Regions:
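Short alpha-helical segments that sit at the start of domains
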Residues: 1-12
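Alpha-helical hairpin
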Residues: 2-3, 38, 67, 85
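Residue-level marker of regulatory loop/turn positions in helix-turn-helix DNA-binding domains and
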Residues: 3, 23, 144
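Conserved RecA-like P-loop NTPase ATPase core
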Residues: 10, 68, 213
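Contiguous, well-ordered alpha-helical segments that form the cores/surfaces of helical PPI scaffolds
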Residues: 11-16, 195-199
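N-terminal helix-turn-helix
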Residues: 13-16, 20, 24-78
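Intrinsically disordered, acidic Ser/Thr/Pro-rich low-complexity regulatory segments
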Residues: 73, 80-241
């Protein structure tokens, strides 16, 4: 569906506010913080239109709005801009991963540790032998989505139910370099507030695996995506050295 420029800017503002706060977003908050040049009344009208078009939804207990998976997809594809990683972070990540390049197991442990630390999420990797590596399990407890013990138990239980994790990763399709799954796209009820970002990583010309992060569906994709891509590239580079 076509959106006006004002609707696109409003959707971007609502999603970024939701990423920051984890709370439904109201017109007053947008008017005060994002300087869109329109009144709260006009913002409310446009929010209703975005809801009708399927980009936003309204929780029953709130007058505010939250993005749908469709809205988040549009934001990631067209509205947001990936951030440039700090040079110091790139150097630190590269040094830590490259220092373990002689042993695949240690290299992947270092890679998921770097992702977990930089993204403050759960980092994970699967090698060509379906060996699972992960780090940062305590990080997800910093996110309100994981205050629900059932959600946290289900996510951590995926590491004991490997076929289920493989099934989730296998749901990604298309030719995107980085695959993203979140929200209503998840078939399991306890995963609908979570997000998975992962990418194929080539260890050698003949072998490959998967690396990525698990966190809230509203994760800051502006920084998460470049970190996942960068770590993937360094792991692949280590395999060629």
């Amino acid at each position: 569906m076509d959106l006006s420029e004002r609707q696109r800017q409003l959707l971007k503002a609502i999603i970024e506010e939701y990423i920051d706060t984890a709370e439904p977003v109201g017109s007053e908050a947008i008017e005060k913080k994002y300087n869109l040049g329109v009144s709260p009344a006009t913002i409310r009208i446009e929010m209703s239109k975005l809801t009708e078009k399927g980009y936003l939804k309204q929780p029953h207990t709130s007058a505010g709005r939250t993005p749908t998976s469709v809205g988040m997809r549009l934001y990631i594809a067209e509205l947001m801009k990936e951030k440039q990683l700090p040079v110091a972070a790139e150097v630190s990540i590269k040094e830590s991963i490259m220092s373990q390049r002689s042993r695949r197991e240690r290299l992947l442990k270092e890679a998921v540790k770097a992702l977990a630390s930089r993204c403050n999420m759960l980092g994970m990797a699967i090698d060509e032998d379906n060996q699972l590596y992960y780090a940062g399990t305590s990080n997800i407890l910093d996110w309100p989505e994981f205050y629900d013990i059932d959600v946290t138990k289900f996510v951590l239980g995926l590491f004991d139910e490997f076929p289920t994790l493989q099934n989730i990763i296998g749901r990604a399709h298309g030719t995107e370099a980085v695959h993203i799954l979140f929200g209503d796209e998840m078939e399991f009820e306890f995963l609908k507030t979570t997000g998975f970002v992962f990418t194929r990583v080539d260890f050698t010309p003949e072998t490959s695996g998967v690396i990525g992060v698990i966190g809230p569906a509203r994760m800051n994709f502006q920084t998460v995506l470049p970190y996942v891509k960068y770590v993937r590239d360094i792991v692949s580079e280590a395999g060629r050295v």
